[in-house]
């Protein structure tokens, strides 16, 4: 599904309440941004979140001011969330979220979030590290497992899993994900 929007088109999307002098355009799917000025005052681009068993990382967030706009419409790609784990949890990881992109000549790319680590049922003492992404995924496992790294300027690292089968929380735009708790089943904060 695609759609076009206009900077002077008012509010498109859910629950935006700008002041009378501000114009907000929200994209929840791919489309084109049709400009009415040569510079956008503020652009926020967020990548899709990572899938999880341990905490999936949030998509990276970019905020820029006074970004130059071309004379034509600007393509917008909205990153999807990552694919979840297979139902049997035997071997396959979840996937990272997809990147979101504003523009093509001088694109702003927000990196998708890292997947959360997991414990395969066939080997409960194994561990899987969280994936790197816009914000890193939390580690998963009954042995300590590393967190995924966040992208500098976009998000924070995930939290590490502990040796008590507690998975780490996914990283976010504001802080690192928490390490897994010291009791099985209690994961870290995301």
Regions found by a protein language model. Give the residues of each.
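Glycine-rich, low-complexity segments
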Residues: 1-26, 154, 158-172
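GGW-centered surface loops in extracellular recognition modules
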Residues: 12-46
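A short, polar/charged loop/turn motif at coil->beta-strand junctions and beta-hairpin connectors
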Residues: 17-23, 36-39, 56, 70, ...
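Glycine-rich strand-loop-strand elements at beta-sheet edges
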Residues: 26-34, 45-103, 118-120, 180, ...
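Acidic, low-complexity glycine/serine/threonine-rich segments
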Residues: 82-147
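Glycine-rich (often Gly-Gly/Gly-Pro-rich) flexible segments and glycine-rich loop motifs
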Residues: 124-174, 188-190
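Intrinsically disordered, low-complexity Arg/Gly-biased segments of eukaryotic RNA-associated proteins
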Residues: 173-175, 182-183
């Amino acid at each position: 599904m695609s759609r076009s929007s206009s900077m002077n088109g008012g509010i498109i999307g859910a629950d935006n309440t700008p002041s009378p002098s501000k114009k907000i355009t929200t994209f929840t799917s791919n489309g084109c941004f049709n400009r009415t000025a040569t510079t956008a005052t503020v652009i926020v681009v967020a990548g899709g979140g990572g899938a999880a068993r341990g905490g999936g990382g949030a998509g990276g967030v970019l905020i820029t001011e006074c970004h130059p706009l071309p004379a034509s419409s600007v393509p917008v790609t909205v990153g999807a969330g990552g694919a979840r784990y297979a139902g049997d949890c035997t071997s396959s990881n979840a996937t990272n979220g997809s990147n979101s992109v504003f523009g093509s000549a001088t694109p702003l790319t927000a990196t998708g979030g890292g997947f959360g680590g997991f414990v395969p049922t066939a080997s409960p003492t194994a561990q899987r590290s969280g994936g790197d992404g816009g914000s890193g995924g939390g580690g998963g496992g009954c042995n300590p497992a590393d967190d995924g790294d966040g992208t500098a300027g976009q998000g924070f690292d995930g939290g590490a899993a502990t040796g008590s089968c507690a998975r780490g929380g996914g990283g976010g735009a504001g802080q690192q994900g928490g390490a897994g708790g010291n009791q099985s089943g209690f994961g870290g904060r995301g």
